[in-house]
Swiss-Prot record:
Key word tRNA processing present: no
Subcellular location: Cell membrane
Cross-referenced InterPro entries: UbiD, UbiD-like_C, UbiD-like_N, UbiD_bacteria, UbiD_Rift_dom
Top-rank taxon, per record: Bacteria
Job of this protein: Catalyzes the decarboxylation of 3-octaprenyl-4-hydroxy benzoate to 2-octaprenylphenol, an intermediate step in ubiquinone biosynthesis.
Topology in the lipid bilayer: Peripheral membrane protein
Binding partners and assembly: Homohexamer.
Protein name per its UniProtKB record: 3-octaprenyl-4-hydroxybenzoate carboxy-lyase
Length: 493
């Protein structure tokens, strides 16, 4: 099932018991965060606050608060089915010629999907039903959440920032938080390596001193939103990828103030520009690490137009110590990463980003080990293959007899198969998340790899331990007589 807009997805969630409407007045200042956080930790539904205090616009929260809802947004019922998305991405990143007639036939569905990629331009889009310009532009009329007591100001969190570099044929979609600065001003917090920041840097180089057009879409259809946080191949636009997942082309329209294309079904569109000479101090804000981050200067986004649907819905979230919504997205997208990594490294059995590791700061990988030093090769590959993992500080590699998603197994492997000096890889001066205050320098720190695999000849001179395993015949016999032993429940072993 595919969803052309956010509202059809809301209806689907509500029909399936995955969305709760809240009519009681709730304040976007702190109260919504507390409610959303409690509900998310209880694995509860998405929330639609129908009467935000001092605002008339409903607020949608916790939309992707469980891996199941992320899967539902992509037309799947089970998060494990998201591996199909990963298979598609792996194919798009590195397509292979058919190995024969049967293989060619099996690839036809992927090629047919690829034909649905280009976005479709529409007229009279829903996102431009109401147009506000000049003095009508007032961002304070939006029910923007003020998430934590130490936050400096309300924060736009789920906006799709749309940019285009002067040397690129496609637009970039990225999600960057934006601090409310005034009635028509937001601070665009994008890190220097992100797509939007790179586009802006190219523009400044080619057109020094000129204003850079930017558009932010709020409340787009769920597939387009998720396309912006998925490892889409660099040569493909997020709109094209969203169409690929949806099975039909993404509908877009031209912005009113520039040539950028925006998702036509969006609830709210903010149009404007960034003056290369206008910067402002951003933060502090509570972040996905569970701490308040440092302040720093970022470009100011001046909003010249606000367009929206009639009776728009404001889509919002909060970030904090895991679990939060980004962590739940990470759990779901974990399944997307597995086939992509396996395509490059077939020896990988499974890959896990534990949500308590702030979505990406720690990874555990199980492999079918084939030679001495194999674990270290996989570590280096994971750090370098996808830019999503350039900030991963810790990688643990285990054998295929260890469940990399079970900490009991992983800790056992670390403590029994590792020598701290021999099996630890340390790399200095690598890119680190700017928000990671534990690094000695902002944006630059170290990485640690833990080889918790069984050691082969060449890696050790000692006789290696053999795991204890019960005789299968004995296990089978005990299973057959268990009820006669008078012990209440048979432990699962």
């Amino acid at each position: 099932m595919s969803f052309k807009d956010l509202r059809s997805f809301i209806d689907h969630l509500e029909a399936n018991g995955e969305l709760k409407r809240i009519s009681y007045p709730v304040d976007p200042h702190l109260e919504m965060t507390e409610i959303a956080d409690r509900v998310l930790r209880a694995k509860g539904p998405a929330l639609l606050f129908e009467n935000p205090t001092n605002h008339s616009m409903p607020v949608l929260a916790n939309l992707f608060g469980t891996p199941k809802r992320v899967a539902m947004a992509l037309g799947k019922e089970d998060p494990l089915a998201l591996r199909d998305v990963g298979e598609l991405l792996a194919f798009l990143k590195e397509p292979e010629p058919p190995r024969g007639f049967k293989d060619a036939i099996s690839k036809i569905p992927m090629f047919k999907q690829a034909l649905n990629m280009p976005p479709k331009t529409v007229r009279n889009p829903a996102c431009q039903q109401v147009v506000k310009t000049g003095d009508e532009v007032d961002l304070t009329q939006l029910p923007i959440q003020h998430c934590w007591p130490g936050d400096v100001a309300p924060l736009v969190t789920w906006g799709l920032t749309i940019t285009k570099g002067p040397r690129k044929s496609r637009q970039n979609l990225g999600i960057y938080r934006q601090q409310l600065l005034g009635k028509n001003k937001l601070i665009m917090r994008w890190l220097s390596h992100r797509g939007g920041a790179l586009d802006f840097a190219d523009f400044k180089e080619q057109f020094p001193g000129e204003r850079y057009p930017v558009v932010v879409a709020l409340g787009s259809d769920p597939v387009t939103i998720l396309g912006a946080v998925t490892p889409v191949p660099d040569a493909m636009s997020e709109y094209a990828f969203a169409g690929l997942l949806r099975g039909e082309r993404t509908e877009v329209c031209k912005a009113l103030s520039c040539d950028l294309e925006v998702p036509a079904s969006s609830e709210i569109i903010l149009e404007g520009y960034i003056d290369p000479d206008e910067m402002a101090e951003e933060g502090p804000y509570g972040d996905h690490t569970g701490y308040y981050n440092e302040t720093d200067k970022f470009p100011v986004f001046t909003v010249t137009h606000i367009t929206h649907r009639k009776d728009p819905i404001y889509h919002s979230t909060y970030t904090g110590r895991p679990p939060d919504e980004p962590a739940m997205l990470g759990v779901a997208l974990n399944e997307v990463f597995v086939p992509i990594l396996r395509k490059q490294y077939p020896e990988i059995i499974d890959f896990y980003l534990p949500p308590e590791g702030c979505s990406y700061r720690m990874a555990v990988i199980s492999i079918r080990k084939q030679y001495p030093g194999h674990a270290k090769r996989v570590m280096m590959g994971a750090w370098s293959f996808l830019r999503q993992f350039m900030y991963t500080k810790f990688i643990v590699v285990v054998d295929d007899d260890v469940n990399c998603r079970d900490w009991n197994d992983v800790i056992w492997a670390i403590t029994t198969r590792m020598d701290p000096k021999r099996d630890t890889v340390m790399i200095d001066n690598t890119p680190i998340d700017y928000l990671d205050f534990a690094s000695p320098v902002a944006g630059l720190g170290s990485k640690m790899g833990l080889d918790a695999t069984n050691k082969w000849e060449g890696e050790t001179n000692r006789e290696w331990g053999t795991p204890i395993v019960m005789d299968p015949k004995v296990k089978q016999k005990i299973d057959s007589i268990w009820d006669e032993l008078g012990i209440d429940d048979s432990p699962t072993l």
